[in-house]
Regions:
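A short alpha->loop->secondary-structure connector
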Residues: 110-120
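Acidic, Mg2+-coordinating catalytic module of metal-dependent nucleases/exonucleases
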Residues: 94-100, 105-110, 140-184
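Conserved non-catalytic scaffold segment of RNase H-like nuclease domains
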Residues: 2-107, 120, 147-155
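Active-site flanking residues adjacent to catalytic metal/cofactor-binding acidic residues
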Residues: 6, 124, 162
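Short, glycine/acidic-enriched loop or turn micro-motifs at the edges of active sites
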Residues: 10-12, 128, 166
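Short alpha-helix plus adjacent loop in nuclease-associated cores
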Residues: 124-138
Length: 184
């Protein structure tokens, strides 16, 4: 069993994004073994196709530059590399993210690029799980949750690999307490 703790960054614009499809521009992930130990990491930029030019707002929010995504591979190649790295076809796995939006965006980009989404069948929203484990009235953001655990947020907020790392720190801290479940 592999636990794949991941985060995504997407194309974005200031204000109303109605009618604009947000594409994945960065995937960051950590592979955790059945004992709660980090095995490896995955970090790739993705070249968007619908809106290939990043907005100034997106660059400011994520620190991802136009040059970074222009030089990146397209989603279809990057997601194949991700699936190979995560051993999706070899090992049982759970995908784990902070909130349910990353799942929606991952599925949407797969559908856009005509990639089967069956491999996204086991997913856990750790934000909801954290709220239950900590008995919080309302969910917290990742940075707040990290700092609430007495941990300094490491890296740059809204960079997929850094957000995934901080999420991994929370996931491994409470490793035996999560109620992981399969979605369909």
């Amino acid at each position: 069993m592999n636990y794949i703790v991941f985060d995504l960054e997407l194309t974005c614009w200031e204000g109303d994004m109605a009618g604009r499809f947000q594409e994945i521009i960065e995937i960051g992930a950590y592979k955790i073994d059945p004992y709660g130990h980090i095995q490896s990491q995955f970090s790739k930029f993705v070249k968007p196709v619908m809106y290939p030019i990043l907005s100034p707002f997106c660059t400011k929010l994520t620190s991802i530059t136009q040059e970074m995504i222009t030089q990146a591979k397209p989603f279809k190649q990057v997601i194949k590399e991700f699936m190979d790295w995560a051993e999706i076809d070899i090992e049982p796995h759970y995908l784990i993210a902070w909130g349910d939006k990353d799942l929606d965006y991952l599925k949407a980009d797969c559908l856009l690029h005509k990639i089967d989404t069956e491999w996204i069948s086991s997913y856990t929203d750790l934000k909801k799980q954290y709220q239950k484990v900590k008995k919080l009235y309302e969910p917290k953001g990742l940075k707040h949750a990290t700092e609430s655990e007495g941990l300094e947020f490491e890296g740059t907020l809204h960079r997929a690999i850094d957000d995934a790392y901080n999420l991994t720190r929370i996931f491994t801290k409470y490793f035996g307490e999560w109620n992981l479940h399969k979605i369909n």
